[in-house]
Amino acid sequence: MADYFCRDAIVRWHCTNERFTAEEYIRANCQYPGNWRGELERVIKKGDCIVTAARVYAADGAPSFHVASFYRLREGRIAELDEYWGDDGPAPAWRRSLGLGVPIPE
């Protein structure tokens, strides 16, 4: 994976206020507990920026998360990566009690 990153790349996980080097980011992902799978749901590319939305889930089916990732490339490699993670689950009770929204069709 290191070949995809610039030597001075910076990765930020905003939801947990963490900043990593590329090496630390790769290590954090490789050593993350459990067996994980992922599905890329959306990709948008404009100039040197790529935005992805993905679902990441445990191999046994639970838990499940979604991540929005913002990549800035330099010379074809990742120079900056900003990720925003969210837990998948039902809408909160207060919103359900108001009768707002409906489930997104699969």
Predicted ranges, named:
Residues M1-E106:
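C-terminal and inter-domain tail/linker signature
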